[in-house]
Amino acid sequence: MSEIFKWLKKSDGDRRHGHADVIVLPEIENGADASQQVSIEAESVPHARPDLECDSSFDINAAEVNVKTVLDPISTVGEQYRILQAKLSLLQQQRGVKRLLITSALPSEGKTFTACCLAGVLAQEKHKKVLLVDADLRMANAWKLLGIKEVGEFKGLSHFLAGEIDMHQALYRSAESELYFLPAGKPALNPVELLSTPNLQRVANVWNRFDWVVIDSPPVVGLADTNLLASFCDAIILVVLANKTPVKLVQEAIERVGREKICGVILNRMKKLDSSRYYNYYYRQSVKQRLGVGSI
């Protein structure tokens, strides 16, 4: 993957806009850190904003087992997400970033799983209201990872963009934290047409009520959806399936969304090394030497 690092290396002139970083997410083995699963309890926020209506709720403890493993505050496999959270919090303080687009070059690289886990970890911080948006109007899967049971037709983003429902009819709120979820809704025959309507700006106005917005976007290569969504976002995180995704396609994805908006690249499903100390040291050195950038 060294060519990806070289491709992301920025000139001194680019650095004034911020830094791109690489976060390495280890492959999660089924049941890892989950032999004694406990319920995930985030500190509740006592003063929820009264101007945000929400008709439905979900239980994060019903989420897919690997999502629960990451969200367990004491899990080792979730540590990289907590590192990412810390970097993003600093970026928010420095640059006011709060709308994060999660995408990948190709399908099946782990972008939806990453978006769900990142949103869940961000919502564990006290007094932070987080919205997870499933904006993949072609192949929505976030609801499955969150453990939401399908009852009839999901009302969601596509219905709102089509002018069929109000936002409160589509939103779900976690019973355990200030994590909200906006499903994709019914699959759209022409997602680009829906995303080009003025109603997308109305959706973005709702996003302003949250401290963080994490948007699961369709893959970049071959589709126009992500570019439309990116114009409403502050930063982009690109998920790359380690040692699988062709470098040329990663390069194409970076160029299509714009390198200046990418705040980080996630190398997903890396094989674990024997020594976690060596693992952390090696990849920190890789970022410094190959990427030529600092922290997010």
Q: What spans do the regions from the language model cover?
A:
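P-loop NTP-binding module
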Residues: 1-296
